[in-house]
Amino acid sequence: MNICIFTDNAYIYEGFCALLPRFPEHTFDFFYSPWNAAFSPRENFWPLRLKEQGPEFYDRYDLFLSLHSKQLFPDELVENHLCINVHPGLNPHNRGWFPQVFSILNGLPVGVTIHRMDRELDHGPILWQAELPIYPQDTSKDVYDRILAKELELLDKHLGDILTGSYTLTPMAGEGNINYKADFDALCPIDLNEPATYGQVIDRLRALTHAPYQNAYFVDEDGKKVYVGITLRKED
């Protein structure tokens, strides 16, 4: 079997590659987004704009895997080929951008979903899911790291099943909700005059604290952004 993998996450890429010696009978080709400055071409790992490809490229592969890819899979691809997504959220809750950010804010469940892709965003019948906790002291980064570890755990357990088609597809439990990049961007500016409880402020800051990124900010009297984060520690 020829497998095409799109990923823009170094941790997932390295963890997935560690699984491959168990499947020597298959061929795995890796691609990343050309605008991903964190990656550079290497053996069997190339930059590629998926939307610029067509049937000549698609037909080379029996399976497409999206592992934290920053590219949307074209309708032509998902409608005519087997495409599976490893999504860092618990579908149908908080589909779209940064599920853990919005789960901290709206209290909806978070976790990992492996699903067959269709034309809609983070949508389609589910192969496997795992729900994960969010603790009061967690920032976005804490939850995200927990999600990544669970994704590799599920791939370690089920990659062989994916390759052999040994799974059952379960419909999503409703359509849930979707968050877009614009929804995240709207969270980042902090209005210092906005009324809020301490709990709301803490949740907003921990949802936006994700090292090394600078997300939350307010604007000072000189018109300069002042970035804000939060550190939380539970007593021993």
Where are the predicted features?
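One-carbon transfer enzymes
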Residues: M1-D236
